[in-house]
UniProtKB/Swiss-Prot annotation:
Entry coiled-coil feature ranges: none
Gene name of this polypeptide: uvrB
Domain Helicase ATP-binding: 25-412
SUPFAM superfamilies listed in its UniProt record: C-terminal UvrC-binding domain of UvrB, P-loop containing nucleoside triphosphate hydrolases
Subunit structure: Forms a heterotetramer with UvrA during the search for lesions. Interacts with UvrC in an incision complex.
GO MF entry, a single one: excinuclease ABC activity
The protein's name in its UniProt record: UvrABC system protein B
Pfam family for this entry, one: UvrB
Organism classification: Bacteria, Bacillati, Bacillota, Clostridia, Eubacteriales
Record keywords, A-Z: ATP-binding, Cytoplasm, DNA damage, DNA excision, DNA repair, Excision nuclease, Nucleotide-binding, SOS response
One BP term from GO: SOS response
InterPro entries named among the record's database cross-references: Helicase/UvrB_N (IPR006935), Helicase_ATP-bd (IPR014001), Helicase_C-like (IPR001650), P-loop_NTPase (IPR027417), UVR_dom (IPR001943), UVR_dom_sf (IPR036876), UvrB (IPR004807), UvrB_inter (IPR041471)
Motif Beta-hairpin positions after renumbering to this chain: 91-114
C-alpha cells in the first residue's frame, strides 16, 4: 500500500510549520471544519502537501476552474511523484444542454463534444481510488455532478490473475457489458482485440499502455502490460483489474429492472398529462421514452441515459446522486482552494440546473425522474464532507463562521512583505499614473492597472500605447489559454503594462510586477470590496520593490479595512524578518509555458510551443526528446503528418539545445 511522501528540497518555513501543525492537530482531533488563511505567496499549496503527508488520507482538492485545477495538479505531482495525483474536470470541449423555450416552441437538443484526454483522466482518477490510498484528486466544481454508482462501477470491473480459471468467451462478454468495444483495426482507449487465445485490452484510464491476457485453455497463463505504440512489454503482472469504459455502465439485469420502472413512471406521467388535456406533450413523451427504452434493450444504453440515472441507481425520488465524492473512502480529506470563489459556485449549481429542467418535464420532453440527474444541493454537499479545510487569503463569513480552527499563514518563506499602500486623488490620475509607469519600467519591472469599466480599460490601453508604452489589455472574453499566454508575455517583457477590470483570477502571481495601480478605488461595489481590494493588493506581494497606489478622493470603509489589514500583516512580517535576520527577496520563478493539462482543459491541441518549459538541464531535455519522438511516431501512425512534422522539428531543436549545453559544460 503506497504512502504519501513529499519530494522537495525545501522544508516548511515562516508560518508554514505552525499552520501545518495546527491543521493536522485539528484533523486528528476530528474537527470537521477548518480554514487555512494564507496570504498571497505564502506557499499554501506546499502547506497543503505537508498536511496530506502527515495525515495520510485520500484527498480531494476542489478548485474553481479547470486551469487552476490543472496548475494545482501539476504542483502536487511534483510534490508526490510516487503517489497517484489525478485530474477530474468536466470532459466537455463544448456543451449545449438539452432545453426547451416555450415562448418560441423551440426544443434544443443536447449537443456536446467530449474531450477524450479528459475522459481518460477521469477514469484514471476513479480507478485509482479503488486501487490505492495515496491518491490526490484535483477537481473542478463539476465533481458535484452526478456520476455512475461507485458500487456498480466496482461490481462491473473484472479481476484477472495468473492461474485463474477463466473462459475466453466469459472475459469477452464481460468486456462488452463494461462497454468496451471490439476493434481489431483501431486499437484505442476503451477497446479490445482478440487473436486466438490472446486478448488485448486498452483500459479506459490508460494513456499509452494496454493489457495482454494470454490464455492456455480456460486458464490465464500470462498477463502483460505493453506499450501500444511499440508493442514492447513494459512489465509482467500477476494480477490486474479492468474497470468499466463508462462511469454509467450498468449490468444487463439492472437495465431490465430499470426499464420496468421507467415504464411504470411513463404510464403515471401520461395519465397526468392527459388529465390536464396536454395531449401533444403526452404524445411527445410517449414517443421519446419508448425510443429510449428500445435503445436500452438493443444496445444497453441510449442517448441521454443520464436522465434515467436515478432509476438505474435505484434511488428514491429527491435522493442525491452519486458523485466523485462517493468514490472516496469514508475517512477522506477535502480542501476547497480559493474557497471565497469556489463555494459560491457550489451553491449556485443546483438552481441553474433545476430551472432548465422544469420546461423539459412540463412540456413532455423528459420524465420527472430527470430532475434527479443533477448536481448536489449545497446541504447535500455539506453532508458528504468528512473533514474539510478551506484555503483562501480572504475567506468569506461562511468559512469563518463554520471553522472550529483557523490557521493563519502571514509570513512568506521568501521574507516578502505585504506592499506599502498610498492613496492619491483622482484629479490628474492618468498623468500621475503615466509618470509612475515610466519610472517603474526604467527599473526593469512591470505594472498592473485595474479599472472599473471595460471602456476605461480599453481607452487607457490605447492611450498608453500612443505614448509608446508596451501595454496589453485582459478582458473576460479572452479564453484561459490566451490569458495564460498574455501573462507569459508580461513576464518576459513583451509587454510592460497589463490593464484589466478583474485582475483577481488565478495565474496573476507575476514576480516582475513592482506596481499595482487601482483606479477609482473609492467607488463602492463588488470590484472595490474589502476582499477584492486585499486580493488585488496581493498581486504586488511577489516583488521586494512592489507597492500599491489607490486613486480615490476619499477612503471608503472597504479601503480602510483593506489598508488596515495589509498594515497588520506587514507589521508581523517585518518583526519576523528582523528577529530572524531575513532580507526580503523577490520570487525567482521560471517562465513556463502553458502546462499540458491546461491545454487539455481548454480542449486545444496538445502540441503548443514548449520552448520556455525546457530548462537548460540535459536530463529534462533528454526526457522531452524521447516524449516528442514517441508523439511523432504516434502522429505518423495516425496519418497526422503535420503534427508529426511539428514534433520532428521540436526534436531537432531540442537536440541542438542539448549540444549547446554540452559545449557550455566543456
Amino acid at each position: 500500500m503506497g504512502t504519501f511522501k513529499i519530494n522537495s528540497a525545501f522544508k516548511p518555513t515562516g508560518d508554514q510549520p505552525q499552520a501545518i501543525a495546527s491543521i493536522v492537530n485539528g484533523i486528528k482531533n476530528n474537527n470537521k471544519w477548518q480554514t487555512l488563511l494564507g496570504v498571497t505567496g505564502s506557499g499554501k499549496t506546499f502547506t497543503m502537501a505537508n498536511i496530506i503527508e502527515k495525515v495520510q488520507k485520500p484527498t480531494l482538492v476542489i478548485a474553481h476552474n479547470k486551469t487552476l485545477a490543472a496548475q494545482l495538479c501539476s504542483e502536487f505531482r511534483d510534490f508526490f511523484p510516487d503517489s497517484s495525483v489525478e485530474y477530474f474536470v468536466s470532459y466537455y470541449d463544448y456543451y449545449q444542454p438539452e432545453a426547451y423555450v416555450a415562448q418560441t416552441d423551440t426544443y434544443i437538443e443536447k449537443d456536446a463534444s467530449i474531450n477524450d484526454e479528459i475522459d481518460k483522466l477521469r477514469h484514471s482518477a476513479t480507478s485509482a481510488l479503488f486501487e490505492r490510498r495515496d491518491v490526490i484528486v484535483v477537481a473542478s466544481v463539476s465533481c458535484i455532478y452526478g456520476l455512475g454508482n461507485p458500487e456498480e462501477y466496482k461490481k462491473l470491473s473484472i479481476s484477472l490473475r495468473t492461474g485463474m480459471n477463466k473462459d475466453r468467451d466469459e472475459i469477452l462478454e464481460k468486456l462488452v457489458e463494461m462497454q468496451y468495444e471490439r476493434n481489431e483495426i483501431n486499437f484505442v482507449r476503451g477497446t479490445f482485440k482478440v487473436k486466438g487465445d490472446t486478448i488485448d485490452i486498452f483500459p479506459a484510464g490508460s494513456t499509452s499502455s494496454a493489457i495482454r491476457v494470454e490464455l492456455f485453455g480456460d486458464e490465464i497463463d500470462k498477463i502483460k502490460e505493453f506499450d501500444v505504440l511499440t508493442g514492447n512489454t513494459i512489465k509482467t503482472l500477476k494480477h490486474t483489474v479492468i474497470f468499466p469504459a463508462s462511469h454509467f455502465a450498468t449490468s444487463s439485469d439492472k437495465i431490465e429492472e430499470a426499464i420496468k420502472q421507467i415504464e411504470i413512471e411513463l404510464e403515471e406521467r401520461l395519465r397526468e398529462l392527459n388529465s390536464e388535456d396536454k395531449l401533444l406533450e403526452a404524445q411527445r413523451l410517449k414517443q421519446r421514452t419508448n425510443f429510449d427504452i428500445e435503445m436500452m434493450r438493443e444496445v444497453g444504453y441510449c442517448t441521454g441515459i443520464e436522465n434515467y440515472s436515478r432509476i438505474m441507481d435505484g434511488r428514491q425520488k429527491g435522493e442525491p446522486p452519486k458523485t466523485l465524492i462517493d468514490y472516496f473512502p469514508d475517512d477522506f480529506l477535502m480542501f476547497i482552494d480559493e474557497s471565497h470563489v469556489t463555494l459560491p459556485q457550489v451553491k449556485a449549481m443546483y438552481g441553474g440546473d433545476r430551472s432548465r429542467k422544469n420546461s423539459l418535464v412540463d412540456y413532455g420532453f423528459r420524465l420527472p425522474s430527470a430532475y434527479d440527474n443533477r448536481p448536489l444541493k449545497f446541504d447535500e454537499f455539506e453532508e458528504k464532507i468528512n473533514q474539510i479545510v478551506f484555503v483562501s487569503a480572504t475567506p468569506s463569513n461562511y468559512e469563518l463562521d463554520h471553522s472550529e480552527n483557523i490557521a493563519e499563514q502571514v509570513i512568506r518563506p521568501t521574507g516578502l512583505l505585504d506592499p506599502e499602500i498610498e492613496v492619491r486623488p483622482t484629479k490628474g490620475q492618468i498623468d500621475d499614473l503615466y509618470s509612475e509607469i515610466k519610472n517603474t519600467i526604467q527599473n526593469g519591472f512591470r505594472i498592473l492597472v485595474t479599472t472599473l469599466t471595460k471602456k476605461m480599460a480599453e481607452d487607457l490601453t490605447d492611450y498608453l500605447k500612443d505614448l509608446g508604452i508596451k501595454t496589453t489589455y485582459m478582458h473576460s472574453d479572452i479564453d484561459t489559454l490566451e490569458r495564460m499566454k498574455i501573462i507569459k508575455d508580461v513576464r518576459t517583457g513583451e509587454f510592460d503594462v497589463l490593464v484589466g477590470i478583474n485582475l483577481l483570477r488565478e495565474g496573476l502571481d507575476i514576480p516582475e510586477v513592482a506596481l499595482v495601480a487601482i483606479l477609482d478605488a473609492d467607488k463602492e461595489g463588488f470590484l472595490r470590496s474589502e476582499r477584492s481590494l486585499i486580493q488585488t493588493i496581493g498581486r504586488a506581494a511577489r516583488n521586494s520593490e512592489s507597492r500599491v497606489i489607490m486613486y480615490g478622493d476619499k477612503i471608503t470603509d472597504a479601503m480602510g479595512k483593506a489598508i488596515s489589514e495589509t498594515k497588520r500583516r506587514r507589521k508581523i512580517q517585518i518583526e519576523y524578518n528582523e528577529k530572524n535576520g531575513i532580507k526580503p527577496t523577490t520570487i525567482k520563478k521560471a517562465v513556463r509555458d502553458v502546462i499540458g493539462i491546461s491545454e487539455v482543459a481548454e480542449g486545444k491541441t496538445e502540441y503548443k510551443s514548449m520552448d520556455e518549459a525546457v530548462k537548460a538541464d540535459n536530463k529534462n531535455i533528454d526526457k522531452l526528446i524521447k516524449e516528442f519522438e514517441k508523439e511523432m511516431k504516434e502522429a505518423a501512425k495516425e496519418l497526422q503528418f503535420e503534427k508529426a512534422a511539428y514534433f520532428r522539428d521540436k526534436v531537432n531543436e531540442l537536440k541542438k539545445k542539448l549540444n549547446e549545453n554540452e559545449e557550455v559544460i566543456k
